[in-house]
C-alpha cells in the first residue's frame, strides 16, 4: 500500500482504467502487487446532471422494466452505486505466497475520442477493442464472451454495438450487467470485470435484463436474452466507455 498510487478519475471508465494501469505497472516491473478498482456513492447532484442531459430513464413507476440496454424501447440509464476492487499480482509472487488465482489479465487498451464530450465515436471504440486484442495476441475468433458497457442510452448503445459488431459480427455472446444494478459510474469497470470473470469460472453467463427486441440501429450481435447461457470459454473482453470520449477494454483469460 506504500507503492504507486495511480488515481483514475475518468467517470465511467475509472474502474477499468485503474485495473489497466495497475496491470501495466506490474507488467513493466514497477510493482509486484496492486489494489485496483473503483467506487461510486449515489449523489443527488450527480443524478441531476444526468437528468439535465436527458440521459436517465423516466420509468420511475416501473423500476423492474428499466434499464433496458440495446432494446428498441430503452429510454436511458439508471444510476447505481457500489464499489469493487481486484488484487493484481505478479504471477510468481502470487504462486510463492499460495494465493488463489482467479484469472489472468492478458490485454488492456484505453484511448480518447478527442471529439465530443457526450457523443461517443464508434471508430475510436473499435480501435480500443482492437488494441486490447492485439496486446493479448488474440484474434476475434478467440473471444468467448463480451461484457458490454450497455448503459441503455440512445447514442451510447448504438455506437458501442456497431463498433463491437465491426470486429466480432454476431459470433460472440454479449450482455450488459448494468441491467441488473444500474450504472455505477466510477465503479462499473471493476464490478463488471470481476463479475464477468466469475461467470467465466462457472461457465454461466447472465442475459441482459429487459432486452426483448434489439434496436435495429444497434449492431447485429449475439445478444444473450431471456435466459442465462452456458458457455465454456477461455477469454472474455470487458469494455467500458465514458463521457468525455474515454474508452477502455480489458481481456481476461480463465485460469486453469
Predicted regions and their residues:
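Conserved catalytic cysteine-centered active-site region
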Residues: 1-21, 30, 53-78, 161-190
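Beta-strand segments within the central parallel beta-sheet cores of soluble alpha/beta enzyme folds
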Residues: 5-10, 31-39, 100-108, 141-148, ...
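Conserved small-residue
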Residues: 15, 22, 50, 87, ...
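Condensing-enzyme catalytic core mediating Claisen C-C bond formation in acyl metabolism
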Residues: 61-136, 145
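Short beta-strand-to-turn element immediately C-terminal to the catalytic PLP-Schiff-base lysine
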Residues: 86-90, 134, 164-165, 251-255
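Flexible, low-complexity linker/loop segments at domain and module junctions
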Residues: 136-142, 219-256
Amino acid at each position: 500500500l506504500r507503492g504507486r498510487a495511480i488515481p483514475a478519475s475518468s467517470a465511467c471508465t475509472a474502474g477499468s482504467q485503474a485495473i489497466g494501469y495497475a496491470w501495466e505497472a506490474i507488467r513493466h516491473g514497477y510493482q509486484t502487487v496492486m489494489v485496483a478498482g473503483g467506487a461510486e456513492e449515489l449523489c443527488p447532484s450527480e443524478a441531476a446532471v444526468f437528468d439535465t442531459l436527458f440521459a436517465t430513464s423516466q420509468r420511475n413507476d416501473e423500476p423492474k422494466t428499466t434499464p433496458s440496454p440495446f432494446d428498441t424501447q430503452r429510454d436511458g440509464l439508471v444510476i447505481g452505486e457500489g464499489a469493487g476492487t481486484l488484487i493484481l499480482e505478479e504471477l510468481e509472487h502470487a504462486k510463492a505466497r499460495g494465493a488463489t488465482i482467479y484469472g489472468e489479465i492478458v490485454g488492456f487498451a484505453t484511448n480518447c475520442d478527442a471529439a465530443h464530450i457526450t457523443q461517443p465515436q464508434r471508430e475510436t471504440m473499435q480501435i480500443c477493442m482492437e488494441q486490447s486484442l492485439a496486446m493479448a495476441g488474440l484474434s476475434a475468433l478467440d473471444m468467448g464472451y463480451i461484457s458490454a458497457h450497455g448503459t441503455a442510452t440512445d447514442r451510447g448503445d448504438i455506437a458501442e454495438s456497431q463498433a463491437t459488431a465491426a470486429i466480432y459480427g454476431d459470433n460472440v455472446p454479449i450482455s450488459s450487467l448494468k441491467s441488473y444494478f444500474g450504472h455505477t459510474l466510477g465503479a462499473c469497470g471493476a464490478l463488471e470485470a470481476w463479475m464477468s470473470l466469475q461467470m467465466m469460472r462457472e461457465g454461466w453467463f447472465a442475459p441482459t435484463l429487459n432486452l426483448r427486441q434489439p434496436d435495429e440501429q444497434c449492431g447485429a450481435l449475439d445478444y444473450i436474452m431471456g435466459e442465462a447461457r452456458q458457455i465454456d470459454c477461455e477469454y472474455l473482453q470487458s469494455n467500458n466507455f465514458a463521457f468525455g470520449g474515454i474508452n477502455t477494454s480489458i481481456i481476461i483469460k480463465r485460469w486453469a
